[in-house]
Design a protein with these regions (language model features):
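Non-heme di-metal
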Residues: 1-248
């Protein structure tokens, strides 16, 4: 068995190529100069994803075993509150950008029905609410990726109000990823658990990359990075990739 802390850090390092590949795709979307309607749709998708994150974390709280450390429950509740605040912040950002109220009753059900572009779907697919290892990996991989993505948006949006809001979200997501790493280092204390975590992490990364491709511009160079590092069996959909030179 590996030392749990070292094992978790190895999983974290194995995420970095994935994170970088997806950052390239998100930056390409913003650098392609999308019109305000495309930005609005993109922000709505991200807003609803935050609400979905809130729902999944609260399920973990409700379904936590009776012997769960109160500190762990407090940490999950802090994350849930952050997700609720992100939901509100992105709604405010959309209304600020469009200068009109957002009808949640109209947009939320449509986005919740979308199965192809939400990172929060990973939580549903891998039974995070009932699987402590899956939940820790979700925090570390999905929330870790989210921190990078929100930071890319904060760095590329020229409006200071939007940039500040998204930088705050990025910082919160970094904290959530840290919670996942701490949690996993405590519970991955057998060879069997570590093997399971390693296999599950690979599945989560694959799902997350394909969701990212569906929700952004699938970039040729990002796909090449993924296939070079993780293998060419990663791409589960036939995305028509775009070379970076077409964006820049």
């Amino acid at each position: 068995m590996r030392d749990p802390v070292e094992f978790v850090e190895e999983i974290w390092e194995d995420n970095q190529v994935l994170f970088k590949a997806m950052q390239i795709q998100i930056k390409a979307f913003y650098d392609s100069k999308p019109n305000i309607e495309k930005l609005r749709r993109n922000f709505i998708r991200r807003m609803v994803n935050e609400r979905m994150n809130l729902n999944e974390i609260m399920k973990s709280v409700v379904n936590s075993p009776d012997d769960t450390d109160p500190i762990e429950i407090m940490s999950l509740c802090k994350q849930a509150l952050d997700e609720a605040n992100h939901y509100r912040m992105v709604k405010d950002a959309i209304e600020y950008m469009t200068n009109e109220p957002l009808d949640l009753a109209e947009v939320v059900p449509t986005e919740l029905a979308d199965l192809t572009t939400k990172g929060a779907r990973v939580a549903e697919r891998f039974n995070v609410e009932h699987d402590p290892i899956a939940r820790g990996l979700y925090q570390m991989i999905v929330e870790g990726n989210a921190s990078c993505n929100w930071q890319v948006m904060a760095d590329n949006l020229t409006d200071p109000v939007l940039s500040f809001s998204y930088a705050k979200i990025a910082a919160d997501e970094r904290f959530h990823a840290k919670l996942g790493r701490i949690h996993l280092a405590k519970i991955l204390d057998t060879e069997e658990k570590q093997q399971y975590a390693s296999e599950l992490a690979t599945k989560m990364r694959k799902d997350l990359f394909n969701l990212n491709c569906a929700g952004n511009i699938p970039i040729k160079e990002s796909r090449e990075m993924i296939e070079s590092y993780y293998g060419d069996d990663w791409i589960t959909a036939d995305f028509n990739t775009v070379p970076l030179k077409k964006i820049y």
